[in-house]
Amino acid sequence: MAVKSYKPYTPSRRFMTTLDNSDITSKPTVKKLLIKLPQKAGRNNLGRITSRHREAGAKKLYRIIDFKRNKFGVPGKVATVEYDPYRNCRICLISYVDGDKRYIIQPEGLKVGDTVMAAEAGLDIKPGNAMKLKNIPVGTVVHNVEMKPGKGGQIARSAGNSCQIMGREGKYVILRLPSGEMRYILGECMATIGTVGNAEYQNITIGKAGRSRHLGIRPQTRGIAMNPVDHPHGGGEGRSKGNHPVTPWGMPTKGYKTRKKKQSDKYIISRRKK
């Protein structure tokens, strides 16, 4: 899959790039795996903005993904590779021998016709197979990793991401996360072998404002361009700066650590690198 550029027929097209989508084999065919999500657009139940610069974006249907991979011992064949508007990686439709069909995140190298399976242990170390962390060899690259047994994968789910199993200690497995953080994860948690596909996604250029709006991203106004009532950086004569960068609510930003202490901090061996 290559990055596709365009001739500059318009100024917005000059720098815009996309992926060629040659890996997509089908449109959605299983309607029971498609649902319509309510559009929050960054608002809470009172209609107030809780997440700025968000909007609904283009109309789309949510694909129900099998993050738990709990269909043990039943082989399934990759029927299609599809586009998912809610994520930057591709998804695969798995058709199991018992007639069940489920979507999974597409690992790098998995193609139509390949067979995948989930089990507690004893499977081949090949992309798409899922096992418990305690039964996967040290050094293996995995994705879609659970943080709590049975909850479903939460770690390393976006395009090109993966974790690496670094060792074992008692009932825990030492995992290196995509950020570089080293962390203990229970060995009972499930993980899928391989790296998430569509790694070239990071190389595309949005190129124009309208494409961001389709993705549900609204424009960001600089604080220095606002009035004093709207932002601590606002006001002044001309272009005045002269103060430390802060959020609209006065909290220091750009490098200031705001992460609260959590009970789960004891599972972090080393924090991520900058």
Curated annotation (Swiss-Prot):
Location of the region described as Disordered in the Swiss-Prot/TrEMBL record: 223-274
InterPro entries xrefs: NA-bd_OB-fold, Rib_uL2_dom2, Ribosomal_uL2, Ribosomal_uL2_bac/org-type, Ribosomal_uL2_C, Ribosomal_uL2_CS, Ribosomal_uL2_dom3, Ribosomal_uL2_RNA-bd_dom
GO terms classed as biological process: cytoplasmic translation
Pfam families in the cross-refs: Ribosomal_L2, Ribosomal_L2_C
Origin superkingdom: Bacteria
Biased composition (Basic residues): 256-274
Composition-biased stretches (Basic and acidic residues): 230-240
PROSITE patterns: RIBOSOMAL_L2
One GO CC term on file: large ribosomal subunit
Keyword entries, A-Z: Ribonucleoprotein, Ribosomal protein, RNA-binding, rRNA-binding
Molecular functions per Gene Ontology: rRNA binding; structural constituent of ribosome; transferase activity
Alphabetized Gene3D superfamilies for the sequence: 2.30.30.30, Nucleic acid-binding proteins, Ribosomal protein L2, domain 3
Family: Belongs to the universal ribosomal protein uL2 family.
Function as written in the Swiss-Prot or TrEMBL entry: One of the primary rRNA binding proteins. Required for association of the 30S and 50S subunits to form the 70S ribosome, for tRNA binding and peptide bond formation. It has been suggested to have peptidyltransferase activity; this is somewhat controversial. Makes several contacts with the 16S rRNA in the 70S ribosome.
Quaternary structure and interacting proteins, as annotated: Part of the 50S ribosomal subunit. Forms a bridge to the 30S subunit in the 70S ribosome.
Name of protein: Large ribosomal subunit protein uL2
Taxonomic source organism: Nautilia profundicola (strain ATCC BAA-1463 / DSM 18972 / AmH)
Gene label: rplB
